[in-house]
């Protein structure tokens, strides 16, 4: 097919049909892009914790669905209203939130949560419809967070797309479209920590490692990493961690006490919660300083979050963040450039690579202690 011929494409995608740990590669139809949309041929995608939650019906149990909101691809065709902005062959990152620059939130520069192009949970694009269907039955397929990157082709509104330098190492671009950037942004944009700050990062997956790197580049003096996987100690140190705590080594001691042991009994200025385990939050808050300690909730959890009012009455702050406070057009290009300049090295994130036809293997790979990031290679 010609790169600039907008027609229905039949391709393969990873489809989730029901609750549970099951995914199948099926033939689907991908419609042409509408006026303000882009159809993308995916080159790489990666697995994020939030993608795995959709197997459990979080945040909404919509099926059939194609997961995936991390990835990088090449523009295959564009809608009639955006031919001057993007063209076939451009390398782009599909994103799960946009930045209009004009709404109250965007103008305030206090948040990255755009009113015009928000994070969407409906499983549909901005006009309330889908661009994907099962090839044999025409059954509508739901998108995942405006994206669905676990497909050979996908359609997305241009306001959720970022054109990038084709010289960028493309697997890195996939990692930066959510996980690592979300962590990196939390100390950089969401809290804007100052030089000499003391921080603790709970959960050293891609998000947590990003938080460590962001804290290091902001000048944090002590960066404590907490994880029950001993393999993460080396990973954390590679990104700038100064101390490591494995709670399994101290079964009779509270994590908050172990953090205070490292910080002269005071706790840390900032805690970054990157586990997505709701039951841990109360203890994480307790690891921050009385009076002005701040905990940033990053990891998405399907359960209600239990917290102690006394912890907050004692002057602590709990704050949530999406994408680490990073604005998709104003801030994300800065992170991409830092990677191209080798200020940020992401080799330590890459642990496993699979083909789309082997997508079912992810459930076992994710259980491996050396797993950090799984890359789907469409080439």
UniProtKB/Swiss-Prot annotation:
<keyword id="KW-0560">Oxidoreductase</keyword>
<comment type="subunit">
    <text>Homodimer.</text>
</comment>
<feature type="binding site">
    <location>
        <position position="100"/>
    </location>
    <ligand>
        <name>Zn(2+) 2</name>
    </ligand>
</feature>
<dbReference type="GO" id="GO:0005829">
    <property type="term" value="C:cytosol"/>
</dbReference>
<feature type="binding site">
    <location>
        <position position="178"/>
    </location>
    <ligand>
        <name>Zn(2+) 1</name>
    </ligand>
</feature>
<keyword id="KW-0479">Metal-binding</keyword>
<feature type="binding site">
    <location>
        <begin position="275"/>
        <end position="277"/>
    </location>
    <ligand>
        <name>NAD(+)</name>
    </ligand>
</feature>
<dbReference type="InterPro" id="IPR013149">
    <property type="entry name" value="ADH-like_C"/>
</dbReference>
<feature type="binding site">
    <location>
        <position position="103"/>
    </location>
    <ligand>
        <name>Zn(2+) 2</name>
    </ligand>
</feature>
<feature type="binding site">
    <location>
        <begin position="203"/>
        <end position="208"/>
    </location>
    <ligand>
        <name>NAD(+)</name>
    </ligand>
</feature>
<dbReference type="GO" id="GO:0051903">
    <property type="term" value="F:S-(hydroxymethyl)glutathione dehydrogenase [NAD(P)+] activity"/>
</dbReference>
<dbReference type="InterPro" id="IPR011032">
    <property type="entry name" value="GroES-like_sf"/>
</dbReference>
<feature type="binding site">
    <location>
        <position position="232"/>
    </location>
    <ligand>
        <name>NAD(+)</name>
    </ligand>
</feature>
<keyword id="KW-0520">NAD</keyword>
<feature type="binding site">
    <location>
        <begin position="321"/>
        <end position="323"/>
    </location>
    <ligand>
        <name>NAD(+)</name>
    </ligand>
</feature>
<dbReference type="InterPro" id="IPR002328">
    <property type="entry name" value="ADH_Zn_CS"/>
</dbReference>
<dbReference type="GO" id="GO:0008270">
    <property type="term" value="F:zinc ion binding"/>
</dbReference>
<feature type="binding site">
    <location>
        <position position="227"/>
    </location>
    <ligand>
        <name>NAD(+)</name>
    </ligand>
</feature>
<keyword id="KW-0862">Zinc</keyword>
<feature type="binding site">
    <location>
        <position position="69"/>
    </location>
    <ligand>
        <name>Zn(2+) 1</name>
    </ligand>
</feature>
<keyword id="KW-0414">Isoprene biosynthesis</keyword>
<feature type="binding site">
    <location>
        <position position="48"/>
    </location>
    <ligand>
        <name>Zn(2+) 1</name>
    </ligand>
</feature>
<protein>
    <recommendedName>
        <fullName>Alcohol dehydrogenase 2</fullName>
        <ecNumber>1.1.1.144</ecNumber>
        <ecNumber>1.1.1.347</ecNumber>
        <ecNumber>1.1.1.-</ecNumber>
    </recommendedName>
</protein>
<dbReference type="GO" id="GO:0008299">
    <property type="term" value="P:isoprenoid biosynthetic process"/>
</dbReference>
<feature type="binding site">
    <location>
        <begin position="298"/>
        <end position="300"/>
    </location>
    <ligand>
        <name>NAD(+)</name>
    </ligand>
</feature>
<dbReference type="GO" id="GO:0046294">
    <property type="term" value="P:formaldehyde catabolic process"/>
</dbReference>
<dbReference type="Pfam" id="PF08240">
    <property type="entry name" value="ADH_N"/>
</dbReference>
<dbReference type="InterPro" id="IPR013154">
    <property type="entry name" value="ADH-like_N"/>
</dbReference>
<feature type="binding site">
    <location>
        <position position="106"/>
    </location>
    <ligand>
        <name>Zn(2+) 2</name>
    </ligand>
</feature>
<comment type="similarity">
    <text>Belongs to the zinc-containing alcohol dehydrogenase family. Class-IV subfamily.</text>
</comment>
<dbReference type="Pfam" id="PF00107">
    <property type="entry name" value="ADH_zinc_N"/>
</dbReference>
<comment type="function">
    <text>Component of the monoterpenoid pyrethrins biosynthesis; pyrethrins are widely used plant-derived pesticide. Mediates the conversion of trans-chrysanthemol into trans-chrysanthemal.</text>
</comment>
<comment type="pathway">
    <text>Isoprenoid biosynthesis.</text>
</comment>
<feature type="binding site">
    <location>
        <begin position="49"/>
        <end position="53"/>
    </location>
    <ligand>
        <name>NAD(+)</name>
    </ligand>
</feature>
<feature type="binding site">
    <location>
        <position position="114"/>
    </location>
    <ligand>
        <name>Zn(2+) 2</name>
    </ligand>
</feature>
<dbReference type="GO" id="GO:0018457">
    <property type="term" value="F:perillyl-alcohol dehydrogenase (NAD+) activity"/>
</dbReference>
<dbReference type="InterPro" id="IPR036291">
    <property type="entry name" value="NAD(P)-bd_dom_sf"/>
</dbReference>
């Amino acid at each position: 097919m010609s790169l600039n011929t907008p027609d229905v494409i039949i391709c393969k995608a990873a489809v989730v049909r029901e609750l549970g740990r099951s995914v199948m590669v099926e033939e689907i139809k991908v419609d042409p892009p509408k006026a303000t949309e882009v159809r993308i041929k995916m080159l790489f995608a990666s697995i994020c914790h939030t993608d795995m939650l959709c197997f459990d019906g979080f945040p909404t149990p919509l099926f059939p669905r194609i997961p995936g909101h991390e990835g990088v691809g090449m523009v295959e065709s564009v809608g009639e209203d955006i031919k001057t902005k993007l063209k076939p062959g451009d390398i782009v990152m599909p994103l799960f939130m946009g930045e209009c620059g004009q709404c109250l939130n965007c103008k305030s520069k206090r948040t990255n949560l755009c009113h015009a192009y928000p994070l969407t949970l409906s499983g549909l694009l901005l006009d309330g419809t889908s661009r994907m269907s099962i090839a044999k039955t025409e059954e509508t397929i739901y998108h995942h967070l405006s994206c669905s990157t676990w497909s050979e082709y996908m359609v997305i509104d241009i306001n959720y797309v970022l054109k990038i330098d084709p010289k960028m190492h493309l697997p890195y671009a996939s990692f930066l479209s959510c996980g690592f950037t979300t962590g990196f942004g939390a100390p950089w944009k969401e809290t804007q920590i100052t030089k000499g700050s003391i921080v603790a990062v709970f959960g050293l997956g891609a998000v947590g490692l990003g938080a460590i790197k962001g804290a290091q580049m902001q000048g944090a003096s002590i960066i404590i990493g907490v994880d029950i996987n001993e393999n993460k100690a080396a990973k954390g140190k590679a990104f700038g961690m100064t101390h490591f705590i494995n709670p399994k080594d101290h079964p009779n001691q509270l994590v908050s006490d172990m953090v205070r042991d490292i910080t002269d009994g005071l706790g840390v200025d900032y805690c970054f919660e990157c586990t997505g385990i709701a039951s841990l939050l109360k203890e994480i808050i307790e690891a921050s300083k009385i009076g002005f300690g701040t905990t940033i909730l990053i990891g998405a959890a399907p359960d209600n979050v239990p917290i102690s009012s006394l912890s907050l009455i004692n002057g602590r702050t709990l704050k949530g963040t999406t994408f680490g406070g990073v604005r998709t057009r104003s801030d994300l290009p800065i992170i991409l450039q830092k990677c191209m300049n080798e200020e940020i090295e992401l080799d330590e994130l890459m642990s496993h690579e699979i083909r789309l036809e082997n997508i079912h293997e992810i459930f076992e790979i994710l259980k491996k202690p050396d797993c950090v990031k799984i890359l789907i290679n469409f080439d």
